[in-house]
UniProtKB/Swiss-Prot annotation:
GO terms for molecular function: D-mannose binding. Retains, but does not degrade MHC class I heterodimers in the endoplasmic reticulum during the immediate-early period of virus infection, thereby impairing their transport and maturation. Forms a complex with beta-2-microglobulin-associated class I heavy chains, which accumulate in the ER. In consequence, infected cells are masked for immune recognition by cytotoxic T-lymphocytes. It holds the Pfam family Cytomega_US3. This is Membrane glycoprotein US3. The gene is US3. It comes from Human cytomegalovirus (strain AD169).
Length: 186
């Protein structure tokens, strides 16, 4: 009974560890160009080699405004245009929402820029987001986390990934080999 209880407690701890990953950093640029616009939500994260963006910006918008979400890297530059269908206007005012899921990234991403411009104006940077890695320990993702942690020299991610992988191997061996619940060391 003790090993089952210990394994259940460890499973709960690891599940809580996966859920306790900090929320993505919200880095708002200090030089806001106008007090008429406000970034209310700004998140970006990695999951299985894909980059996800989610955010909301409100203010004094017209249909001529559009928001660009761009990936900034030392070796690569990509601008994802968010316009048209994300523009909303209701009793609270006009706002933009973006929820871009699963943009494939094969390079190092340093930052995600949020820029605002009109059809004829120059884009002005309003916010930036540093992507965080969201943890999902399944058999398909372990290899991706190991590669990413070694590439980025992220020892915490490497340690957590190896710990969860070894724990899952031990549980797999205990369940498949049929070891009795009376282990001497527990």
């Amino acid at each position: 009974m003790k090993p089952v209880l210990v394994l259940a407690i460890l499973a709960v701890l690891f599940l809580r560890l996966a859920d306790s990953v900090p929320r993505p950093l919200d880095v708002v640029v200090s030089e806001i160009r106008s007090a008429h616009f406000r970034v209310e939500e700004n998140q970006c994260w990695f999951h299985m080699g894909m980059l996800y963006f989610k955010g909301r910006m409100s203010g004094n918008f017209t249909e001529k405004h559009f928001v660009n979400v761009g990936i900034v890297s030392q070796s690569y530059m990509d601008r994802l245009q968010v316009s048209g269908e994300q523009y909303h206007h209701d009793e609270r005012g006009a706002y933009f929402e973006w929820n871009i899921g699963g943009h494939p990234v094969t390079h190092t991403v340093d930052m995600v820029d949020i820029t605002l411009s009109t059809r004829w104006g120059d884009p002005k940077k309003y916010a930036a987001c540093v992507p965080q890695v969201r943890m999902d320990y399944s058999s398909q993702t372990i290899n991706w986390y190991l590669q990413r942690s070694m590439r980025d020299d992220n020892w915490g991610l490497l340690f957590r990934t190896l710990l969860v992988y070894l724990f899952s191997l031990v549980v797999l061996v205990l369940l498949t080999v049929g070891v009795s619940a009376r282990l001497r060391f527990i």
